[in-house]
Amino acid sequence: MLIDFNELSEITIPNMNGGEGKVIAKMDVNDCGRFIQTVIPPKSSIGPHLQETNDDINFIVFGEGIAICDDSEEILKAGTCHVCPKGSTHSIINVGDEDLVFYTVVPQK
């Protein structure tokens, strides 16, 4: 299976999960799970939300940010991977001057 994010439609989500600013995403949903390309512009964030049914795996490719998962703060930068396990609450904040870009995999279990 190949997912080509260049072929997917972009959606803009204002104040995602109560966060600041906007989030820009491209998503593919299939039998394996959800696969998402996400861009969080400077001064924007994804607000705190519960991972009710699956883990949330985020591979950072560009920019700087912070993930807060169950009150634990993690520094995000290119080459890092933030995992929020099922049952945990997390948020992602762009703390840099450039876009924070990452790919998320939410496996279907």
Label every model-predicted segment:
Residues D31, T53, D97-E98:
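Short strand-connecting beta-turns/loops that link adjacent beta-strands
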Residues I36-Q51:
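Conserved short histidine dyad/triad with adjacent acidic residue
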Residues S45-G47, I66, H82, K86-I92:
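Histidine-centered metal-chelating micro-motifs
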Residues T53-G65:
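Glycine- and acidic-residue-biased ligand/ion/polar-headgroup-sensing regions
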Residues S72-K86:
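Short acidic-glycine-tyrosine-enriched beta hairpin
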